[in-house]
């Protein structure tokens, strides 16, 4: 896939972003990429990493735990971290 054909990082799902990031890491670890291309894919990797962190943070904020009343019955939900 050429650089112009790659989708915008912000439009990728978490799973697709991680898969592309893993591919970039593998290419860089092999060491068979020209310096200019290495810099370009490293920069895309940084953007993918940031995007994944943003998506994970958003997912963590959505996770809730169930509150129980004294009888042990579900009473509602609250943020997982208690905030």
Swiss-Prot record:
Domain of life, per lineage: Bacteria
Q: Where in the cell is it found?
A: Cytoplasm
According to the record, the signal peptide region is: none
> Can the keyword Hydrolase be found in this entry's annotation?
yes
Q: According to the UniProt record, what class of enzyme is this?
A: hydrolase
- Entries under InterPro entries matching the protein: Exonuc_VII_S, Exonuc_VII_ssu_sf
Chain's role: Bidirectionally degrades single-stranded DNA into large acid-insoluble oligonucleotides, which are then degraded further into small acid-soluble oligonucleotides.
What name does UniProt use for this protein?
Exodeoxyribonuclease 7 small subunit
Q: Supply the source organism's classification.
A: Bacteria, Pseudomonadati, Pseudomonadota, Alphaproteobacteria, Hyphomicrobiales
């Amino acid at each position: 896939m050429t650089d112009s054909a790659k989708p915008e990082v912000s439009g990728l799902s978490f799973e697709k972003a991680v898969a592309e990031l893993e591919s970039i890491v593998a290419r860089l670890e092999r060491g068979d990429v020209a310096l200019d291309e290495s810099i370009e894919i490293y920069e895309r990797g940084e953007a993918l990493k940031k995007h994944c962190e943003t998506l994970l943070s958003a997912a963590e904020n959505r996770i809730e735990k169930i509150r129980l009343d004294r009888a042990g019955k579900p009473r509602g939900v609250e943020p997982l971290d208690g905030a």
